[in-house]
Structures are given as C-alpha cells and as structure tokens.
Amino acid sequence: MGRSLKKGPFVDAKLLLKVEKMNERNEKHLIKTWSRASTILPVMIGHTIAVHNGKQHVPIYITDQMVGHKLGEFVPTRTFRGHAGSDKKAARR
C-alpha cells in the first residue's frame, strides 16, 4: 500500500528547508542528511545530497529520473563480497 495522497510525500522538514534556501540563493553545495526515507521532489533536481549509508555519507547528484523515489534507494547499506567459493579439495575426498 502506498502513502495516502492527502498526506503527500514524506520529506524531512530540515532537508526541504535547506534545499529551498539554496534555490533562493542560487547555490549548489553538498547537503548532508541521514534521512534515507525522504522522497525526492522536483525542487531537489540539480543538487548533490550526501546520504548516510550507516558508515559514511555518499554523495548523490539528483536528476529528473529520480523524482518520486526515496533517497535511500540510491545508497546501498551493505557491501556484497561474493558467495563462498567451492572447496574443490574437499569435494574430491
């Protein structure tokens, strides 16, 4: 189930405030956020937002294709190092 239309998309209030202030001043610098659940809105296009992945902030450049998605979708929290290799010596015995 999606979010109710009368509520609108969730965006962290402080993040939205920072983006709107930067738009008024025509500034483009990095914005750090921990809010992975925030929805990307059209006012964020062209900004670089550093989203926390649990260890560090990963910079994401917002494009028009990302509108409607969540910030956390573009920053993986887990590093996949591959499946366990087959032990051929043990298989022969």
From Swiss-Prot:
Keyword field contains Lipid metabolism: no
One example of a Gene Ontology biological process annotation = translation
Q: Name one GO molecular function term.
A: rRNA binding
Point out the coiled-coil segments of this chain.
none
Q: Which GO terms describe its cellular component?
A: cytoplasm; small ribosomal subunit
Keywords recorded for this protein, A-Z: Ribonucleoprotein, Ribosomal protein, RNA-binding, rRNA-binding
**Pfam families found in the cross-reference section:** Ribosomal_S19
Has keyword DNA repair?
Answer: no
Matching entries from InterPro entries are given as: Ribosomal_uS19, Ribosomal_uS19_bac-type, Ribosomal_uS19_CS, Ribosomal_uS19_SF
SUPFAM superfamilies hit by this protein? Ribosomal protein S19 (SSF54570)
Protein purpose: Protein S19 forms a complex with S13 that binds strongly to the 16S ribosomal RNA.
Query: Which protein family is named in the record?
Result: Belongs to the universal ribosomal protein uS19 family.
User: What name appears for this protein in its UniProt entry?
Assistant: Small ribosomal subunit protein uS19
Q: What is the lineage of its organism?
A: Bacteria, Bacillati, Cyanobacteriota, Cyanophyceae, Synechococcales
Q: Which gene encodes it?
A: rpsS
